[in-house]
Amino acid sequence: MSDFLPFSRPAMGAEELAAVKTVLDSGWITTGPKNQELEAAFCRLTGNQYAVAVSSATAGMHIALMALGIGEGDEVITPSMTWVSTLNMIVLLGANPVMVDVDRDTLMVTPEHIEAAITPQTKAIIPVHYAGAPADLDAIYALGERYGIPVIEDAAHATGTSYKGLHIGARGTAIFSFHAIKNITCAEGGIVVTDNPQFADKLRSLKFHGLGVDAWDRQSGGRAPQAEVLAPGYKYNLPDLNAAIALAQLQKLDALNARRAAIAAQYHQAMADLPFQPLSLPSWEHIHAWHLFIIRVDEARCGITRDALMASLKTKGIGTGLHFRAAHTQKYYRERFPTLTLPDTEWNSERICSLPLFPDMTESDFDRVITALHQIAGQ
């Protein structure tokens, strides 16, 4: 229907069009100077030292795990309440994903669940900054230091998120996403930030065929023709067309996230009169990026199942999302791990629903969602 309200819509405007035109007019549309500008901008945003732009956050996760030497027989701890790409990358490297439970009300992986899963085979910990809120990094990094295990932060939801006064990605290694529904987007893309120069060099090589140089050299205005392959790599570089859009979006980040926060505040106020339960906020000091606004739809409390609510909203022209169906309940993973049970993850996986939330959402759009929720709750 023409007036369908989507769950998400990218906030694009004249700035993004101008950025694309600049790249097209330059004659250099693949990986080039705009990538280097984007990497420098993310170092400034996060406060970290190095940044490597990639074609997607999934690509970033793949080469980050490879750069750590993750392989056959290794274990990587991550919550099941995440998008399956993380699990897929672990499995495709021959390693074993060790999925752990999350806090029932914040859906954050906890240090207690992580520590209980650590074995001599554990080679990495991947906490997820869920829905735009930060995980408890101090406690998680303390575990990593105590056991000598690297931490890779899944920051796909966390552009604009801060933890105890520091932007996510200020230390260690973190991976951000520029997918179409994220807080800033360039259709597809991602970036890895890190404080380790050797690790950054490995990422640059792995993302571009295993060459010993970056995909674009500032001095030569292209790739050095004498570049050699140091080890087999991938083609995960980001075109400058995408990087230019991401840069234009990044300049708007504060305004985009402020609008998201305002809509989230309205949702919280409206939920006081509705049976649907929003997620709780973490107790530690933070700034929430409000990538998602998630409610839990418990049939005993709401008189309707989550799936029925989503279907009913769709008939009213309102889109919703599911973030996420627990990874261990997906066909491949439930067959590989048939005895795995994660009670709080599973309870939420059956009940969570993401409501429309995007910067260009109008007051009329918001009122439409709340009116529909009242109508459904009153049936």
From Swiss-Prot:
Q: What is its EC number?
A: 2.6.1.87
Q: Which residues carry this modification: N6-(pyridoxal phosphate)lysine?
A: K182
Q: Report a single Gene Ontology molecular function.
A: pyridoxal phosphate binding
Instruction: Keywords in alphabetical order, please.
Output: Aminotransferase, Antibiotic resistance, Lipid A biosynthesis, Lipid biosynthesis, Lipid metabolism, Lipopolysaccharide biosynthesis, Pyridoxal phosphate, Transferase
Reaction(s) catalysed (UniProt annotation): UDP-4-amino-4-deoxy-beta-L-arabinose + 2-oxoglutarate = UDP-beta-L-threo-pentopyranos-4-ulose + L-glutamate
Q: Has the keyword Transferase been applied to this entry?
A: yes
Set out the biological process GO terms recorded for this chain's protein: lipid A biosynthetic process; lipopolysaccharide biosynthetic process; response to antibiotic
Pathway-wise, it operates in: Nucleotide-sugar biosynthesis; UDP-4-deoxy-4-formamido-beta-L-arabinose biosynthesis; UDP-4-deoxy-4-formamido-beta-L-arabinose from UDP-alpha-D-glucuronate: step 2/3; Bacterial outer membrane biogenesis; lipopolysaccharide biosynthesis
Identify the Gene3D superfamilies for this entry.
Aspartate Aminotransferase, domain 1, Type I PLP-dependent aspartate aminotransferase-like (Major domain)
Show the GO cellular component annotation of the record: membrane
Name a Pfam family for this protein. Answer: DegT_DnrJ_EryC1
Enumerate the cofactors the protein uses: pyridoxal 5'-phosphate
Q: Ribonucleoprotein: present as a keyword of the record?
A: no
User: What is the enzyme's class at the highest EC level?
Assistant: transferase
Q: What does this protein do?
A: Catalyzes the conversion of UDP-4-keto-arabinose (UDP-Ara4O) to UDP-4-amino-4-deoxy-L-arabinose (UDP-L-Ara4N). The modified arabinose is attached to lipid A and is required for resistance to polymyxin and cationic antimicrobial peptides.
Q: Which family does it belong to?
A: Belongs to the DegT/DnrJ/EryC1 family. ArnB subfamily.
State whether it acts alone or in a complex, and with which partners, per the record.
Answer: Homodimer.
Protein's UniProt name:
UDP-4-amino-4-deoxy-L-arabinose--oxoglutarate aminotransferase
Highest lineage ranks of the organism? Bacteria, Pseudomonadati, Pseudomonadota, Gammaproteobacteria, Enterobacterales
